[in-house]
Amino acid sequence: MIVQALTQYYQTMEQAGKIAAPGWGPVKVSFALYLGANGALERIVSVQTEQIRGKKTVLAPQVMNLPAPVKRTVGVAANFLCDNSGYLLGIDDKGKPKRTMECFSACKALHEKLLEGVDAPAAQAVLAFFRTWEPKKAREHPALAEHIDDILAGGNLVFRTEEGYVHENPAVRQAWETYYSSAGDGPRGICLITGEEGPVELSLIHI
């Protein structure tokens, strides 16, 4: 009974937007990549907010509700719609260009897998971006000029179009949730409360 009550409480909080839904979580984001309908990078805008720390006012990353990030160790593992410059742009200051290209390629493959059949301009813009973006020419791109040092420092980036943030698009959200609940590579199990199969993380949320 206690577990069932906790489950109902969780679902109520989720519906009210007070906690993240399964497959989603709070992520610190520093910049938004604005894409045109053809996938071209039009500009990069800081989404950092001013915060008071002690006697100083500093710029801090904005916390957004995004697809749950992967747990990285030493291998290459891309995140969906939000990552650092190595994965989304194919450039960083780590001095390992071959590995950085592997990161970009992995990120491109993930987005092609999840967005290929999504009938939404935002999804198609992201696909077009990955298919046309040239990491070797990235540092020369005018959109990066103003924030290049901060971007290479490792902050997270997200995609945005004229419609808004891509991760907030209903069709894109559905694509991610379908992938997360049925096509993840991690261990799976049956929830004792709902009887639904899903990633172990989903089942543990109910306990």
Q: Which residues does each predicted region cover?
A:
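Short Cys/His-rich metal-coordination motifs, predominantly Zn2+-binding knuckles/fingers
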Residues: 194
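Conserved phosphate-interacting/catalytic interface
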Residues: 1-189
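Short, non-ligating residues that shape and space the ligands of small metal-coordination modules
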Residues: 197-201
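Conserved small/polar residues in nucleotide/adenosyl-binding loops
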Residues: 205-207
